[in-house]
């Protein structure tokens, strides 16, 4: 639906003022907050038109209007066309991304924690694309009770996993050297797809430690199919103080519903986007974490319909920009 430039300005004011202080918009408040050189009567007509088009609704308790779900969606779609990375509270993101000594799960957790603190809303990260990680090193360490620790270096930190199989130190070392030699610089997905061909051509060389490699590939294949969620609620205290109890209960319910979180984050686009709820629902601003153009994870900031979309989108843009720099 096409809106005139003036209607867009008025709608933006209505949304931003309601987000800021829950104040319904009137023709008088629009005139006070814009440089539009038109009469109050003209502004009243514009508000009437926006209401008739479904972007605003009138409250019974006052003469003012507030945004509808349709109004929020129009505002957010236009906002996300030109997101600026301006959040100074996210300066530490660069250091976190560049730290290769941490695990992938640590990096994801730290990023989610920083975003939650910066936006004052709970943040969820879902990792569902480890096949896109670039491999740098393998270290396999035998443990007690027929277990082995597998450490895999990647371009986004290391992955660690304890697997249920027994092996000698020598076979673990040989398997580590073999996997590093042939798959360093390749993606996890490439290794999982092609490992059988490599092993067929080298059956004599790898016979002693083939069982170790088989167990690792089996474990990584299983891990690759999993969707790992990391929920950070550092920013929730301020949100709880600001929002009414009904909104907070809905958000907490969603945070405790793993299936719903996975369903929402599975639908993340390859750019910053938002799922704006119907009236009185939960909204999610989402962004992908990409590796070589392929999705490694999805970040979702969860809040009420009346949330700070601009600030959240800016925070996510900082993270996306830093990850893109790291990827080059």
What would you call each of these model-derived segments?
Residues 83, 87-328:
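Intrinsically disordered, acidic Ser/Thr/Pro-rich low-complexity regulatory segments
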Residues 1-12:
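Short alpha-helical segments that sit at the start of domains
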Residues 11-16, 285-287:
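Contiguous, well-ordered alpha-helical segments that form the cores/surfaces of helical PPI scaffolds
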Residues 27-79:
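N-terminal helix-turn-helix
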Residues 16-23:
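Short helix-capping/hinge SLiMs at alpha-helix to coil transitions
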Residues 2-3, 38, 67, 85:
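Alpha-helical hairpin
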Residues 21, 58-62, 81-88:
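Short, flexible active-site-proximal loops enriched in glycine and acidic residues
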